[in-house]
C-alpha cells in the first residue's frame, strides 16, 4: 500500500518555520484590511440579541478574567473570550467571505482566536499578522483541494475555521512541528457545524466554537496534550470525515504553500452588503436596475430572479418574518433593493421586515429555480416588469467586494467607521484604524484591544 502523503506533518513544519519576511506586502495589506473589517463587524455584533445571550453565558462559565470581549468591559479566559469574539465577528453576517473555494468566513474565527490569545501572551502586531496569515493560508490550502463540505450538510465556516484558528494560535505560541500536529489533531475533533443552521443564532455560534476550539487546541498542545499526528490525511481522519474518503488531493495541499499566500492571490472577499454572500449578485443586479431606471416601486408589477437549484433550496424563503432570516433570503434582499434602493444594517431588523409595505413587496418577487444556471450561481439575472408592461433586466456576474471587483482601502475604512461608531467613540475608532494600518509597529496587541473598550 502506498504511503499516505504527509499533509499534517508538512503543513506543521511550514507553520513552525515560516518567516514574517516571506509574506508579501500585498498579503499583509490585505490581512490588515480583513482584520479591521472583522473588528468593525464585531463591534456591530455587540448590539445584537445573540451577543447579549452569549455575554451572559460567558459570565456564568468564564472565571479567569484575562482577555477582553470586544466592545465591552467584560473579560473572560482566552478560550471564552475567543468564543465571544468569534460570535461577535459573525453575528450580523457582515464579515469577509471566500468567493472561490467554499472556505466560508475565515477571518472572524482566526482573528478572534489569535487576538484573544495574543492579549494574554502580550504578542506584538507583527506576531499577530504572521499568525493570522498562516491560519488563513492553511485552511484555504485544505479547502482549495477538497470538495464543498456544505454539499455534505456541514457548515464550512467552523469546519475549516477550527483548523485556521488552531494554526494561528500555534504560530503565536511558537509551537514545535510535533506540537502543531497535536494542535491540529485536537482541533479536528472539535470541528463541526450543520449548514442548516443559517438564518439562526447558531450560525455565529459556529464561528464562536471554532475560535474557542483553536485556542484550546493550541494551549493543550503547548502543555504536551497529544493527538493523532496525521489527522488531516489519515483514514477516518479530518478530510475523510468531512469531505468523504478519496475526495481530497493531498499532493496539491502541500504544493507551493505560501507561494503566494492566499491573502495575496486569489484573496478573500469583503462584504459590501450586510447579508449573506450568496445574495450579492442578486443585490447588485437589483440595485443597478433601481438606480439606472429610477424605478418607483409603486410602478412595479413583479420581479423575477433566476438562481440554480441548490441556491434555490438554500436561499429562498417562502416566509420572512425576522431580520436574521432576511439576510439569507434572496427574495427579501431583492425586494428591499427595488423598494428602498439600498441595503443597510437597519434593512435586516425584525421591525423593518414586518412593515406592511415590506411584506407586500415580498409578494412581488418570484424566485425561479433555473437548472440552466450552473452551481453555485456564477451570475444572477434579475428582471423587473412594470405595470405598463415595460420589462427591465440586468445580470450581475462579479459582486462588489469580490477580490475581482474589490472594495478600495478607503471603502473598507469607511465601512469600519460606520460600524464602529455604534459602540465606541470616534477617537477610539481612529486610534484602532491607525493601529491596524501600521500593525507591524504595534508592540503589544493590548493597544488594539483597549481601543475597543467603550469609554
Enumerate the language-model features and the residues they cover.
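Glycine-rich, mobile lid/loop segments that gate access to catalytic sites or pores
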Residues: 118-217, 228-235
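Hydrophobic alpha-helical hairpins/lids featuring a short glycine-rich hinge
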Residues: 86-143
